[in-house]
Swiss-Prot record:
Record has Cytoplasm as a keyword: no
Function: Attaches a formyl group to the free amino group of methionyl-tRNA(fMet). The formyl group appears to play a dual role in the initiator identity of N-formylmethionyl-tRNA by promoting its recognition by IF2 and preventing the misappropriation of this tRNA by the elongation apparatus.
Listed name of the protein: Methionyl-tRNA formyltransferase
Naturally occurring in which organism (per UniProt): Xanthomonas oryzae pv. oryzae (strain KACC10331 / KXO85)
Binding site for (6S)-5,6,7,8-tetrahydrofolate: S108, L109, L110, P111
Highest taxon in the source lineage: Bacteria
Enzyme class: transferase
Family matches, as Pfam families: Formyl_trans_C, Formyl_trans_N
Family indicated by similarity: Belongs to the Fmt family.
GO cellular component, one term: cytosol
EC number: 2.1.2.9
Disulfide topology: none
Keyword entries, A-Z: Protein biosynthesis, Transferase
Annotated signal sequence range: none
Recorded name of the encoding gene: fmt
Length: 307
């Protein structure tokens, strides 16, 4: 089959590899190069890097709504377009171009967590399971019927980064299964999404990473896990702004104001929350690297005297 692949971040790379394994990827669409790093130089997306390594033509339009972009898509004579975390809305005219339309690999069990950040929102909400859906795209945000799906459990201490990697691999497998069926002349049965259970995974931003100690420790611990490795939770700890890379909730009764230091040891730094306490295990000072609580306490001997 002739496939157009549209994707941008690391999450999409495994799916591109799966599509290229037994099919002809005639073009890759990805977001324009963006400034990144300390030098703010233009940096290609992970999908672009993979496409170039495979010798696949790369297109980086600012929009797919122009007549020129539509003409280019039509000229590729694609059987199918596969979309994985592309970052651009596909208008109806684009959805109708490939013979079999457009498929999307989405990192949630739809209709739960439609939108931009399903992996992190699932952890933040305390979900115990998630998965991947292969969806036939329709106009609208992740509303199309589901062709195939796979579910997995979320680990009790699993971070956003760890779950991201597992779902990227699972998404590639589900896509490969779907492409295999289509190649054999079997079109997967499209199941409409239920009207009940719809939730939206709104885009992450750095402001959401600021923790409020007045919230329950369980909620804060989930946010620390969800926002690792980006945008990384941050909070004021003993008068200092730090980033939190690892923490667990303690069901600990106390009478201290939120944000108070309850205990400090090599096992972690316990901070009073609105309900329970948060044990900080891995943290990062401004301008520094992530370190264990034990290493942090070596630099903050004053905290040992306060415990």
């Amino acid at each position: 089959m002739r496939i157009i692949f549209a994707g941008t971040p690391d999450f999409a790379v495994a799916s591109l590899r799966a599509a290229a394994q037994r099919h002809e990827v005639v073009a890759v669409y990805t977001q324009p190069d963006r400034p990144a790093g300390r030098g703010r130089g233009l940096t290609p997306s992970p999908v672009k890097i993979e496409a170039i390594a495979r010798g696949i033509a790369v297109f980086q339009p600012q929009t797919l709504r122009s007549p020129e972009a539509l003409a280019t898509l039509r000229s590729l004579n694609a059987d199918l377009m596969v979309v994985v975390a592309y970052g651009l809305i596909l208008p109806n005219a684009v959805l109708a171009v490939p013979t079999h339309g457009c498929w999307n690999v989405h990192a949630s069990l739809l209709p739960r967590w439609r939108g931009a950040a399903p992996i992190q929102r699932a952890i933040e909400a305390g979900d115990t399971e998630t998965g991947v859906c292969l969806m036939q795209m329709e106009a609208g945000l992740d509303i199309g019927p589901v062709l195939l799906s796979q579910r997995i459990e979320i680990g009790e201490q699993e971070t956003g980064g760890q779950l991201h990697d597992r779902l990227a691999a699972l998404g590639a497998q589900v896509l490969s299964d779907g492409l295999g069926l289509l190649r054999a002349g079997i079109r997967p049965v499209a199941q409409p999404q239920p009207a009940e259970g719809v939730t939206y995974a709104h885009k992450l931003d750095k402001a959401q990473a600021r923790l409020d100690w007045a919230q329950p420790a369980q909620e804060l611990a989930r946010r620390v896990r969800a926002f690792n490795p980006w945008p990384v939770a941050e909070a004021i700890l003993a008068g200092e702004r730090v980033r939190l890379h690892g923490a667990v909730a303690l069901e600990l009764a106390h009478q201290q104001p939120p944000g108070s230091l309850l205990a400090a040891s090599k096992q972690g730094i316990d901070i009073a929350c609105g309900q329970g306490a948060l044990r900080v295990r891995v943290l990062q000072r401004e301008g520094g690297k992530a370190i264990t609580a034990a290493d942090y306490l070596n630099a903050r001997r004053d905290l040992l005297a306060l415990r």
